[in-house]
Structure formats: C-alpha cells, structure tokens
Design a protein with these regions (language model features):
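Alpha-helical multi-pass transmembrane bundles of energy-transducing inner-membrane proteins
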Residues: 1-11, 102-114, 118-166
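Interfacial segments of multi-pass membrane proteins
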Residues: 44, 124-129, 204-219
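Cytoplasmic/organellar membrane-interface segments at the starts of transmembrane helices
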Residues: 178, 234-274
Length: 274
C-alpha cells in the first residue's frame, strides 16, 4: 500500500464517517473493547504460553498501530467528531473488564481481563488528540506488552508447570519456597498496577491527562482503572505469594525459577522499571 499517496487523498465528510465506522470496528475487535472482547478470554486461556505472550505483546498492539497508520491521518474529521463515543466505549470497557477481573479465580483469566482494561486506557489516550495522550498511549502499549508477557510467563511458565493448576484459590505462601520468583512476580505486579517508577505509570498518567483535557467528566470515570487495577493485582499477588502458610495442595520441594526463567523475567522487569 502506498501510504504517501493515500494520505494525499481528501475524503469528504460522509466518506470519512463510512470508513471510520468500518475501520474502527475492525480495530475495536483487535483492541478489544466491550461487546467485542469475548474472543480474547478463550484465546488466552486455551492457548499455550507462547500463544498468550504473542497475543498480549504483539497482536493486541496491532490495533494501536492501525489507528496511528490509518484512522488518525486519513480520517481526522470523523475521529475528532466521534471522540466522545470512543471515550464512552473505553470507559464502559474499563469498568466492565475491571469488575470481571475482580471476580475471576483463574490467573490467566485475570491477566487477560486486565489486558482489556489497560487496552481501553491507551485507546482513549490516542484519541484524545493531544500530544500527552498520544505519547501516553504509545508508552502504555509498550509497557503493557512487557508486563503482561511477564505475568503470563509467571502464571503459565512457572506456576502452572510446577503445580498443574491456574486457580488462585489453590495457591498460598509461595514466597516461602520461591523467594526469587516472588520478587520478580512482585515487580511485574507493581507494573500492572501502574505504580510510580514503572513505564505503565508514565503511559497511564499521560493517557488519562489527555482524556482530562478533552472530556474531564469521562476522565474521572476512566481514572477508576487506577483503583481497580491495584485491587485485583494486589489480591492476585497477596493470595499467591503470601496468604498464610504454604498451601497443603503442593509439594514442599517445588523449585524456584531456573536460570532461563530468571533471565527472561529479569529482562522484562528491566524494561518495565523506568
């Protein structure tokens, strides 16, 4: 595709609207947003570890690339006029995904639902038409790729391989026998919460700042993602790593992370911490 020639095309307003609806719905499936996110849960839960990592780090970010490559430069008038609809969809997605995350007991489901919530934050950031919002959306997209990949490795590549279950209710006191893993898992969990000194915080803060500049009221509701992400991530980490004595369902001789797992997780942790 010759994008230079495409960008020189001046579409009239009705054509922009028609193209905007079609292209945005396609990218909303890939983001994903509310009503179009049902495929993501099964894709994450049923796929192997490598599939979950590729899906979280690369495939979901293709919508962000497509928005920057097609929607914003080609359809500026339609994007500007329908920002409030995208914001409304984003806010509903954040709240719905967060409540769904709070009720799940499967680790991979929890990380998958949190991906939906974070994706909605960078979606509304890039449509804010502000420098801060667009840069924040890019930063949050990168940060989410590092953190979610690390969390999926922790859930599927470390915990599931050693225990044979992904249910949070079976875990307790892992920090007693896997201290090195617990430290790496803790830092990645902090990144998922968006605490300061992580790339997630920079991206989330700038995205929400861009939202507040355009529509302050919806920005207030979008900011609930900060509270919700802390709630379900702290619950997940606290129940798995601490939560009392070591769970009786597991063997006491479960090994800590090996060198391969350690260096993979350490690389993602380094990219996560600012």
């Amino acid at each position: 595709t010759d994008f230079d020639a495409l960008y020189k095309t001046n579409f009239n307003y009705s054509t922009q609207l028609f193209l905007f609806y079609g292209i945005f719905i396609a990218f909303a499936v890939k983001t994903p947003t509310i009503f179009l996110n049902t495929w993501l849960l099964k894709a994450h839960v049923e796929s192997p570890l490598s599939g979950s990592i590729i899906l979280a780090a690369i495939v979901l970010k293709l919508s962000l690339y497509g928005i920057f490559r097609l929607i914003l430069p080609l359809l500026p008038k339609a994007s500007l006029d329908y920002t409030y609809i995208i914001y409304l969809i984003g806010v509903i997605t954040i709240i719905y995904a967060s409540f769904s995350t709070l009720r799940t007991i499967d680790i991979k489901e929890l990380i998958a639902y949190s991906s939906v919530s974070h994706a909605a934050v960078y979606l509304i950031g890039v449509f804010s038409n502000t420098i801060q919002g667009i840069e924040g959306g890019i930063a949050l997209g990168l940060a989410h790729g590092f953190v979610s990949s690390g969390l999926f490795i922790c859930a599927g590549g470390v915990l599931y391989d050693r225990s044979g279950t992904r249910l949070i209710s079976f875990y307790r006191g892992i920090a007693q026998i896997m201290p090195l893993f617990s430290i790496l898992f803790f830092i990645l969990s902090l990144g998922n919460c968006g605490v300061p000194l992580t790339l997630n915080f920079v991206g989330e803060f700038m995205s929400l700042y861009g939202v507040f500049e355009r529509l302050p009221l919806l920005g207030v509701f979008a900011s609930s993602s900060i509270v919700f992400s802390a709630a379900y991530t702290i619950y997940m980490f606290n129940r798995i790593a601490f939560g009392g004595s070591f769970s009786k369902f597991f063997e006491a001789n479960i090994s800590d992370v090996n060198k391969r797992e350690f260096f993979i997780l350490l690389t993602l942790v380094i990219f996560t911490v600012v």
